[in-house]
């Protein structure tokens, strides 16, 4: 069955960007190429929205104002007013992952989040980011987040908390990779069984699912950041 699945024609193949030679080694580059495309899309959309800012917003400006303000309010509700300074990073993570996920539904494109290396990179960034902000706020006292409520249990809690925190990047990586890769395989199978009727409803279902996965990544990042910023008693 796997040998009969057709290979889609991708833009990266046409431009010979699937693999590149770096330091004499041939390395996989497809996911990096489509990540660049996702960033380029966000940059262009940002420029368009910025140039068309008016006191009476049009449809595009109104859409982004509602989207951004909703996410900002959600962040402030969960973290407090302090969350406003972290909001640009959080919304940036959501928008980048959302566009990367949706690229998998566009002809000639592939979702970079269907490659585990992309997700590892973003998960490590989240891990380093929330721990950095926690250490920045609490200094040496940040270790209290790992010690638990009792000094007697502290040695055991530190071990458990370290394992828990180290598992977070793995969880973020596998959750996003598994869902996006699985959706692409299922969509291809539906297309083979029913090229038109069976694909259109599933296509829009997966569109929502890909946005949901970006939102889940944003929510988990928010939760980890909130935990790092809260006072440890």
UniProtKB/Swiss-Prot annotation:
Pfam (any one): ATP-synt_A
GO cellular component, one term: plasma membrane
Membrane topology qualifier: Multi-pass membrane protein
Transmembrane segments: 29-49, 86-106, 108-128, 140-160, 185-205, 206-226
Highest taxon of source: Bacteria
Subcellular location: Cell membrane
GO process annotations (BP): proton motive force-driven plasma membrane ATP synthesis
Keywords linked to the UniProt accession: ATP synthesis, Cell membrane, CF(0), Hydrogen ion transport, Ion transport, Membrane, Transmembrane, Transmembrane helix, Transport
Sample GO molecular function, one term: proton-transporting ATP synthase activity, rotational mechanism
Assembly and binders: F-type ATPases have 2 components, CF(1) - the catalytic core - and CF(0) - the membrane proton channel. CF(1) has five subunits: alpha(3), beta(3), gamma(1), delta(1), epsilon(1). CF(0) has three main subunits: a(1), b(2) and c(9-12). The alpha and beta chains form an alternating ring which encloses part of the gamma chain. CF(1) is attached to CF(0) by a central stalk formed by the gamma and epsilon chains, while a peripheral stalk is formed by the delta and b chains.
Family the entry assigns: Belongs to the ATPase A chain family.
UniProt-listed HAMAP family: ATP_synth_a_bact
Biological role: Key component of the proton channel; it plays a direct role in the translocation of protons across the membrane.
Name used for this protein in its record: ATP synthase subunit a
């Amino acid at each position: 069955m796997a040998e009969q699945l057709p290979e889609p024609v991708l833009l990266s193949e046409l431009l010979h960007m699937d693999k590149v030679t770096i330091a004499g080694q041939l390395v996989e580059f497809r996911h990096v190429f489509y990540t660049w495309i996702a960033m380029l899309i966000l940059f262009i959309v940002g420029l368009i929205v910025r140039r068309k800012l008016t006191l009476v917003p049009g449809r595009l400006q109104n859409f982004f104002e509602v989207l951004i303000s909703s996410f900002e309010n959600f962040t402030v509700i969960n973290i407090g007013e302090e969350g406003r300074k972290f909001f640009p990073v959080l919304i940036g993570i959501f928008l980048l992952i959302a566009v990367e996920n949706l690229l998998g539904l566009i002809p000639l494109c592939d979702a970079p989040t269907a490659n585990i290396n992309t997700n590892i990179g973003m998960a490590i960034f989240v891990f380093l980011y929330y721990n950095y902000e926690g250490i920045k706020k609490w200094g040496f006292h940040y270790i209290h987040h790992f010690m638990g409520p009792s000094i007697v249990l502290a040695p055991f809690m530190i071990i458990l908390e370290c394992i828990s925190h180290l598992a977070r990047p793995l969880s973020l990586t596998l959750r996003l990779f598994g869902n996006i890769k699985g959706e692409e395989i299922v969509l291809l199978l539906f297309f083979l069984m029913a090229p038109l009727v069976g694909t259109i409803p599933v296509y829009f279902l997966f569109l929502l699912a890909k946005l949901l996965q970006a939102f889940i990544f944003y929510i988990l990042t928010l939760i980890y950041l909130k935990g790092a910023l809260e006072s440890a008693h």
